[in-house]
Amino acid sequence: MPEARTSNFDRMNKFGMTESFVKHKIGFTEVTIKAPEQETSDLCVKAWEDLQENHPVTPDDIDCVIVCTQNPDGKGLPHTSAILHEKLSLPLSCAVFDISLGCSGYVYGLSVIKSFMEENEFKCGLLFTADPYSKVKNNDDKKTATLFGDGATVTLLDDKPVFECGKFVFG
């Protein structure tokens, strides 16, 4: 997560909210904000670095990467997954692609990467979800300014799972 934060308490008066509303309805008191020069792939790199602190995985272990984002690097080309492929020094044989989804992206992405890995007999894959909403959100919009921040996650799927995915139910 980016280190910079914006307090939702600081926006209470602007949007006519109470402290109780912020705590109990919004559910969090601050949103993370990326640095102006940070791109989506930079947030993914940080998530990867955090993952490596707890799991012994190297770039050479990775067979595939999916990046789920609605806010890709730059203007969208090359795809964020291709940029991330280079930044992480992944093998040339590593398959990478993006999925453009928002809130439902993690569930769909997990279903896609699970199926993709099974079909191609891959042993290790990474699912990144990353969205720097500060690139597109209107900070004067009460409905989104206090809800959407910037961040990235990564989920490691390998042949030694701690948890297993069951059947996915959509709808």
Label the model's feature ranges.
Residues S20, D63, K123:
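Conserved acidic residues
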Residues E118-A152:
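Flexible, glycine-rich active-site loops centered on histidine and acidic residues
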Residues K23-K25, T29-S41, N71-C124:
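Conserved catalytic cysteine-centered active-site region
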Residues C64-N71:
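Short glycine-rich or small-residue beta-strand-to-loop segments that form or flank ligand, phosphate
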Residues C68, S100, G125-D131, L157:
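Short beta-strand segments
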Residues M1-E37, D141-G171:
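Condensing-enzyme catalytic core mediating Claisen C-C bond formation in acyl metabolism
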Residues A47-D63:
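Phosphate/pyrophosphate-binding loops at sites that engage ATP/ADP/AMP, CoA/4′-phosphopantetheine
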